[in-house]
Curated annotation (Swiss-Prot):
UniProt KW keywords: Lyase
Cysteines paired by S-S bonds: none
InterPro entries: Ectoine_synth (IPR010462), RmlC-like_jellyroll (IPR014710), RmlC_Cupin_sf (IPR011051)
Protein family per UniProt: Belongs to the ectoine synthase family.
Listed GO MF terms: ectoine synthase activity
One BP term from GO: ectoine biosynthetic process
The protein's annotated pathway: Amine and polyamine biosynthesis; ectoine biosynthesis; L-ectoine from L-aspartate 4-semialdehyde: step 3/3
EC id: 4.2.1.108
The encoding gene: ectC
Pfam families: Ectoine_synth (PF06339)
Gene3D superfamilies assigned: Jelly Rolls
Function: Catalyzes the circularization of gamma-N-acetyl-alpha,gamma-diaminobutyric acid (ADABA) to ectoine (1,4,5,6-tetrahydro-2-methyl-4-pyrimidine carboxylic acid), which is an excellent osmoprotectant.
Record-given protein name: L-ectoine synthase
Length: 135
């Protein structure tokens, strides 16, 4: 059984900070679950251009409001607490948090991330094999 406390893990190297967001990676590849699980905060007013070419992601909004735009269709969806979206086609997208407050999101990645990934210029994490080959 794996038990982790967000309030404690936020103070460890499981917390990753970047421009416009921070994330606490509660489950990673080494945990052997077949997916990774993160609590991610999108900073108020952030606009993030992302494209997870090598991962599928599902996201559930717990706090805050914003929107996600599917760059293939141009369709924009409002995000608020209780809304889930899934990037089931490695969808290129723009995620926006409204200016008033951050959004707190619960995120699941498949395949799981290792915890060492950083977003590339294209907004993607590298494939696990590419990450291992660069180590």
């Amino acid at each position: 059984m794996i038990v982790r406390d967000l309030a404690k893990e936020i103070l460890t190297d499981r917390r990753v900070d970047s421009d416009g967001w921070s994330s606490v990676r509660l489950l990673l590849k080494d945990d052997g679950m077949g997916f990774s699980f993160h609590i991610t905060t999108i900073h108020a007013g952030a606009e993030l251009h992302m494209h997870y070419k090598n991962h599928l992601e599902s996201v559930f909004c717990m706090e805050g409001t914003g929107s996600i735009t599917d760059l293939a269709t141009g369709e924009t969806h409002e995000i608020r607490p209780g809304v889930m979206y899934a990037l089931n086609k490695n969808d290129k997208h723009i995620l926006r948090a409204n200016a008033g407050a951050p959004m707190m999101m619960a995120c699941v990645f498949n395949p799981p991330v290792t915890g060492k990934e950083v977003h590339g210029e294209d907004g993607a994490y590298p494939a696990d094999a590419a990450l291992e080959n660069s180590a």
